């Protein structure tokens, strides 16, 4: 699994989940699953286009990865928007927020995303 820490003007984009029920209302770095035969970078660009309707490019992968259950791991990359404007699409997210480093603790992040916050804060 891959997530995008979308950065702009010293802020990072957080997305509030609408599903599944146990994740609804909590915040994450948007992203999703890497399909068979797909590179993590290609998957991340595809997922952001599907979820937020914009095109991004990977700037750098953050260090580390986090286990999600027994079958998946999460990697997060710093990315920047190269075309379009991120928009919440209700099938995945109902709100987006641009957060300064000092505001990262203001939202209820999903657990797998939390270890990456310090890297984003230091960014």
Regions found by a protein language model. Give the residues of each.
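A structural signal for short, well-ordered beta-strand segments
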Residues: 4, 44, 76-79
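The catalytic Nudix box helix
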Residues: 29-61, 100
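Active-site-adjacent beta-strand/loop module that shapes the phosphate/pyrophosphate-binding cleft
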Residues: 55-56, 64-87, 95-103, 120
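Charged phosphate-binding loop/patch that engages nucleotide di/tri-phosphates or the phosphate backbone
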Residues: 112-123
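A conserved beta-turn-beta hairpin within the catalytic core of GNAT-like acetyltransferases
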Residues: 21-25
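Conserved N-terminal beta-strand and adjoining loop/helix that marks the start
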Residues: 1-13, 33
């Amino acid at each position: 699994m891959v997530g995008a820490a979308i950065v702009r003007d010293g802020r990072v984009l957080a997305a509030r989940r609408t599903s599944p029920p146990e994740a609804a209302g909590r915040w994450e770095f948007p992203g999703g699953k890497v399909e068979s035969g797909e590179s993590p970078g290609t998957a991340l660009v595809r997922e952001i286009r599907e979820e937020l309707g914009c095109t991004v490019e990977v700037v750098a992968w953050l260090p580390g990865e986090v286990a999600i259950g027994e079958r998946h791991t999460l990697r997060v990359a710093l990315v920047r928007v190269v075309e379009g404007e991120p928009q919440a699409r209700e099938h995945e997210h109902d709100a987006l927020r641009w957060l300064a480093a000092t505001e990262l603790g203001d939202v209820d992040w999903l657990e797998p995303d939390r270890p990456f916050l310090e890297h984003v804060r230091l960014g």
